[in-house]
Amino acid sequence: MLEFAKRESARAVTEKRRALEARLEKIKVEEEKQRHATDHPKEARKRRRVDTSSGDPGPEQDDQFILDDYDSDADERMASSKKLSDISGLSTSTLELLERFKEQFSAPVEDEIGHEDDDVKIFYCSRTHSQLSQFSSELRRVKMPSSMPAELSTSDANTDEVQERVKHLTLGSRKNLCINPKVMSLGNAAAINERCLELQQPGIAAEKRCPYLPSKEDEGQILQFRDHTLATIKDIEDMGKLGKRMGICPYYASRSVLKHSENVLLKAQKIVTLPYPLLLQRSARDALDLSIKNHVVIIDEAHNLMDAICNIHSVTIRLSQLQTALLQLTTYAHKHKARLKGKNRSYIAQIIRLVSSIRDHLRSILGQNLPAEGTVDPSDLMAGKGVDQINPYKLSRYLQESKLARKVDGYVEFLKNKNQQSDDKPSSPVLFLVQSFLLSLMNPSAEGRFFYLKCHDDIQLRYMLLDPTNQFREIVEDARAVILAGGTMSPMSDYRNHLFSYIAPSRLDTFSYGHVIPPENLIAHTLVNGVLGSEFDFTYDSRDSEKMILDLGRTVATLCQAIPDGVVAFFPSYDYLSRIVAIWRKPLEGEKGETILSLIEREKSILYEGRDMGPKTDDLLQEYTRTIDSGQGALLLSVVGGKLSEGINFSDKLGRGVLIIGLPFPNIRSAVWQAKIQYVEQKTYNSSSGSEKDRQSIAKAAGKDFYENACMRAVNQCIGRAIRHRNDYAAIVMIDRRYEKANIQGKLPAWIKESMLRRSVRRPASALAADLSNFFSGRSPR
C-alpha cells in the first residue's frame, strides 16, 4: 500500500514536471519569435507608471535627510526579529510574497519520494560577467538526458518528445540588474544598494517607491518571469532585458527563481552562475539569501581566487577623501543639529572624532621623512582625543543600520543642485568608502594589515587581507564539493599549503590535463644569451645594463624575423618597459642613425601597451589585428599583469609567438610583500614541528615558495594567451637565465615543460631562430 502511494505521488510529480517542460518549450518558441521581430518590439506585459521625477521630495523639504531615531540598546533587542529583512534587503511585503511562493511549492511529497538528497545545485562562479556569458553560451549547446522516468508517465501523448532542459539561473548585483533609471544613474554600487533599500521603506509614499519592485499583487508576473528565465539559457544582459520587457525588477525576481528552485518540479539539472563577489563575500550571500549547503561549487579562473578573496575584503581610502568626508559630516551635523536626537548626535560625533584621528595620523606620516610606503598600527589611527571611549561594536552597527552615508550624500547632492553646481561626471559617494574603511578598522581580521602609500601630495591608507583561508573556509565546509578550475592553475602548492591548509591531504584531489593541441604544434624554449653573446639576467641588480638591453633588442628583431604574423612580448613592469624603449630609441654607434626600434620595424610594426589605457585597450587590439591582417606583422610590447596579460585571447596569427622577458617578481622591498611573506613564514613556523633551526628553515622555504609562485602564476597567464584551440600553433620563448633553474621550470604548466624537455639542449639565439623558422615553415596560416 505504501509503495503504491509513493509510486502514485511520484507519477503525479513527473506529470507536473512534463507539463512544466511543455510550457517552457512554448515560451522558448515565443522568445525566438520576439528576437526575429526586434524591429517591432512588443509592449511590456505589464505597463507600469514610472515616476519621472527625481524620486526625492521637493527641494523645499528637508525631512528626507533627517536620520530616523536610533537607540542602540533597543535596536539590539530587536535585531533578531529584523535579521532576515535587514540581511536580505527586501521590503516586508516582498519577503512575505517570496515566503508564500516557497511554501506553495514545497510539497510534502518530496520526503515521501525521497528526492531531497538528490536536490543538488551547481554554483558556477567566475571573475567577470563576460566570462559567465561565455559559459552560458556554451551551456546552450548542452543536451542533458531526462531525469523523468518514462514508466511513471500516464500521458497518452508521446512523452519522449518533451525534452527536459537544463535549469539555469544567472545572478547579479543590483548594479548589474537594476532597471530603475534614477537609481542606475547613481553609478556607485554602494549608493545603488542604499537607494534601492531606501525606496522600499514603509515611510516612502507609494508614488515615490520603485515601480519595478515585486509586490503581493505580482504573484502571477513573478511566476511568468520564472518560466521565461528557465525557458532558455540567459546571461546577465538577457536577464536585464527580460526585466525591462516585463516591467519587473530582475534583481528581486531572479531571487524568487532561486527560491522556486527548491520546488520538487525543478529538482534536476540546476545551474546557478554568479560572479566572484556574490559567492566569496558572506554579506553578499546573505543579501541574496544564498545557501550553498550540500551543493557543488565550481570556481573558474581559479588562479585568481586567492587574490580575489583578499581584494574583496580589502579597502583603500585617501587623505583627500577623509578630508572631504569630514567636511560633509560636519556640514550635515551643523545644519541638522537641532533635529538630531541624542543617539544620532552622539554617534555622528564619534564618527567625526574617529575620522579626524585617522586624518591627523596620515598628515603626520605625510609630514615626516618616512619611506614612501609602510605599515600602520591600528592603535595609531585611533589615538585621537576621545577615540578610546568609542564602542567599536556599537559604532559598527550604527554605520550599517542608520543609513548615515546615504543621508549625508543625499544632502550634499541637494546642496550642489541648490547652488547649481554640477560635475562633468558623477563622483563616487565618499561617505560609503569611509564607512567601508571604518568597518574594517572597527573589526579587523587577524589576517589583515594596514598600509600607507604616499602618492604625490596625497597619501592613501589601505586595509589589506593577507590570508584568504578563513574567508573561504565556510564555503568549503558547507559545500558538498568545491572544484577549482583554470587553464593555468600551476603552481599548485599555494592552494594546498595556504587556502586548504586545514584539510587532510586525502580529501584533496588535483588533476592536470594535457593541452588540446598535439605536441608538434608547440615549441617552447628558454633563451639565456643574446645574438651578441650577452647573458640575459633581468634581476634587480643587473637589469639596467645598457649592453644587455641593446642585445635584447637585436635578439627580439632576430626572433621577429623567424616568427610570422603577430608576436606579443611581455615585460616585468611598465617602468621597465619604458626604460627599455628609451634605450632602443637611441641611435646605434656606427649604424648611421639606425636604432634598435628601426631594426625591429624592418620585420614587424611595433605597438605599445600604456599604463593607463583603459577603454583605449580595445583600440590598440583592433590596430594590432588590422596590422597583422594587412600582412605587415606586428610586435605588441605589453606588461605582465597588465590589461593584455589576462583575459585577452591571441589565437591563430594574433599570437604566433609569445616572448616573456625576465621574471615578474613582485617588489620584495614593498611593505605589502614584506608583510605577506612575514605572515606566511610565521604561519608556517607555528604549524611546523622539530628543532628551532628546522622550523625556521621550513618557514623561510615556505616564504620563498610563496613569492616564486606569485611570479610564476603571472608568467603562466601570459603563456596561456596564445594557443586557444586544437588547431592553433605557436612558439613560447622565455628570456632570462633563471628560466633554466629547476625550481622555476617546475612551476610551469605540464604542457610547456613537455615541450621544453624535447628541446632540453641550450641553444644560442641564432640557432633558436633557425629552429623557429623550421617550426613555422610549411604550416598553413589560419
Swiss-Prot record:
Its cofactor is [4Fe-4S] cluster. Its EC number is 5.6.2.3. ATP binds at S80, S81, K82, K83, L84, S85, D86, I87. [4Fe-4S] cluster binds at C178, C196, C210, C249. GO terms for biological process: establishment of sister chromatid cohesion; interstrand cross-link repair; mitotic G1 DNA damage checkpoint signaling; mitotic sister chromatid cohesion. Pfam families: DEAD_2, Helicase_C_2. PROSITE patterns: DEAH_ATP_HELICASE (PS00690), HELICASE_ATP_BIND_2 (PS51193). A motif (DEAH box) lies at residues 300-303. One of its GO terms (molecular function) is ATP hydrolysis activity. NCBIfam families: rad3 (TIGR00604). PANTHER family: ATP-DEPENDENT DNA HELICASE DDX11-RELATED, DNA REPAIR DEAD HELICASE RAD3/XP-D SUBFAMILY MEMBER. This is ATP-dependent DNA helicase chl1. It comes from Aspergillus fumigatus (strain ATCC MYA-4609 / CBS 101355 / FGSC A1100 / Af293). The lineage of its organism: Eukaryota, Fungi, Dikarya, Ascomycota, Pezizomycotina.
